[in-house]
């Protein structure tokens, strides 16, 4: 079989290549969005609006409960706050949600939302229901700088980082859609979060960290760090910091075990090689047999799926004494993709070789392929549909809501 010649991709740039200003900027209507603010920033926003410090502390506590525990977006429903104070808040502040441009449901129950920011940037999130859990796949950037050749998002240019409000807003919107307010630890559909949507989370470290701290706060969304996984293609200098400052589970987009192949399909490898990446995994704070590091490995026909590749992967995991499991991902096709998925028998053989070495290597069942929501298929629909068409859809949605 003839393969396309490898294309030399630019090596991704420095950390946080598109910084987002962290000062509070009013919306077009002059109001400040409270979503995404830390407790201290929420209190400071009230003080800046001339509320005296003692009042600001009390109101911040009440607002926190209504925003993150009850899911409120309207100050009028916050009944333990005096009516005149609710009016005062409504004049100065807002609790936002991302704009939903399009919502799709797969035949397997997977849901995908196309979202649009205030400045007109589009990004996607996906909810994957299972019998024992429900996982929300969250985006961290509009586009991506990594250029991974098997990934649809990698064909997009990086536009900008998502803000903490835009990241946590995806979780809030999913809770809205699932009817899961007030927040409660038992019986909810949204049980897990994976930072595996559009973008490289560690190239937007501060905003991802701040958003996940909101998600993990016990007085609000209250999702345990053990139910959150952050995926990186291998931004080695930021991995230890992620473990120390966020402390969630780590997944690594490995996908190849030779320099030649990984340089081609994950260009970041030319900056941070496999050996350095695996050492960073070995040093990751909190990794142990109860909290294993997940290695993601997309199965590409005649590219990375030989028996020798499986055995070398086992050798490397043992060499670095990594508490690890391997997720084997059948390649999910997208228009113009340069690869094909490995044959099912080859995937099964690859998995079996790793299992026989005592390392868990399940094959992930593709979910949401029919709506381009599966792993590696996300791409802003603004690049697949005309802006006029998207605007028309948004207008029709608004008209339907009255």
From Swiss-Prot:
Its cofactor is [4Fe-4S] cluster. Coiled coil: none annotated. Its main location: cytoplasm. Binds 1 [4Fe-4S] cluster. The cluster is coordinated with 3 cysteines and an exchangeable S-adenosyl-L-methionine. Transmembrane segments: none annotated. It is an enzyme of class 2 (transferase). InterPro entries: Aldolase_TIM (IPR013785), Methyltransferase_A (IPR040072), RlmN_N (IPR048641), RNA_MTrfase_RlmN (IPR027492), rRNA_lsu_MTrfase_RlmN/Cfr (IPR004383), rSAM (IPR007197). This is Dual-specificity RNA methyltransferase RlmN. One of its GO terms (molecular function) is rRNA (adenine(2503)-C2-)-methyltransferase activity. One of its GO terms (biological process) is tRNA methylation. It catalyses: adenosine(2503) in 23S rRNA + 2 reduced [2Fe-2S]-[ferredoxin] + 2 S-adenosyl-L-methionine = 2-methyladenosine(2503) in 23S rRNA + 5'-deoxyadenosine + L-methionine + 2 oxidized [2Fe-2S]-[ferredoxin] + S-adenosyl-L-homocysteine; adenosine(37) in tRNA + 2 reduced [2Fe-2S]-[ferredoxin] + 2 S-adenosyl-L-methionine = 2-methyladenosine(37) in tRNA + 5'-deoxyadenosine + L-methionine + 2 oxidized [2Fe-2S]-[ferredoxin] + S-adenosyl-L-homocysteine. Disulfide bonds join 137-375. Belongs to the radical SAM superfamily. RlmN family. The active site is at residues 124, 375. It is found in: Cytoplasm. Keywords: 4Fe-4S, Cytoplasm, Disulfide bond, Iron, Iron-sulfur, Metal-binding, Methyltransferase, rRNA processing, S-adenosyl-L-methionine, Transferase, tRNA processing. S-adenosyl-L-methionine binds at residues 199-200, 231, 253-255, 332. [4Fe-4S] cluster binds at residues 144, 148, 151. Specifically methylates position 2 of adenine 2503 in 23S rRNA and position 2 of adenine 37 in tRNAs. m2A2503 modification seems to play a crucial role in the proofreading step occurring at the peptidyl transferase center and thus would serve to optimize ribosomal fidelity. Pfam families: Radical_SAM (PF04055), RlmN_N (PF21016).
């Amino acid at each position: 079989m003839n393969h396309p010649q490898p294309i030399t991709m630019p090596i991704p740039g420095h950390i946080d290549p598109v910084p987002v200003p962290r000062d509070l900027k009013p919306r077009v209507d002059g109001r400040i969005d409270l979503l995404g603010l830390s407790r201290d920033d929420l209190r400071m926003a009230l003080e800046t609006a001339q509320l005296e410090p003692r009042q600001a502390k009390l109101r911040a506590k009440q607002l926190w409960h209504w925003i993150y525990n009850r899911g409120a977006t309207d100050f009028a429903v916050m009944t333990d706050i005096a009516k005149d104070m609710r009016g005062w808040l409504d004049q100065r502040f807002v609790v936002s949600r991302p704009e939903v441009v399009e919502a799709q449901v797969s035949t397997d129950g997977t849901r995908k939302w196309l979202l649009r920011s205030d400045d007109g940037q589009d990004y996607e999130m996906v909810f994957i229901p299972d019998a024992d859990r429900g996982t929300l796949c969250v985006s961290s950037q509009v586009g991506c700088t990594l250029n991974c050749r098997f990934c649809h998002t990698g064909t997009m240019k990086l536009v900008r980082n998502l803000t903490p409000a835009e990241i946590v807003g995806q979780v809030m919107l999913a809770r809205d859609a699932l009817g899961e307010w007030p927040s409660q630890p038992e019986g909810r559909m949204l049980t897990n979060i994976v930072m595996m949507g559009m973008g490289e989370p560690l190239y937007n470290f501060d905003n991802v960290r701040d958003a996940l701290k909101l998600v993990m706060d016990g007085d609000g969304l209250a999702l345990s760090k053990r139910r959150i996984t952050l995926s990186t293609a291998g931004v080695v200098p930021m991995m230890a910091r992620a473990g120390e400052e966020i402390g969630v589970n780590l997944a690594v987009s490995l996908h190849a075990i030779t320099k030649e192949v990984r340089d081609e399909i994950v260009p970041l490898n030319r900056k941070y090689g496999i050996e350095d990446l695996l050492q960073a995994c070995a040093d990751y704070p909190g990794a142990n047999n109860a909290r294993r590091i997940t290695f993601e490995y997309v199965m590409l026909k005649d590219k990375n799926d030989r028996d020798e590749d499986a055995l070398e992967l086992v050798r490397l995991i043992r060499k670095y004494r990594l508490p690890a499991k391997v997720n084997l991902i059948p390649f999910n096709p997208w228009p113009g993709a340069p690869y094909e998925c490995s044959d099912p028998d080859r995937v099964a053989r690859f998995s079996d070789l790793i299992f026989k070495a005592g390392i868990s290597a399940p094959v992930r069942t593709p979910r949401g392929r029919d709506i381009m929501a599966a792993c590696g298929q996300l791409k802003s629909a603004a690049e697949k549909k005309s802006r006029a068409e998207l605007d028309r859809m948004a207008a029709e949605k608004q008209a339907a809501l009255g």
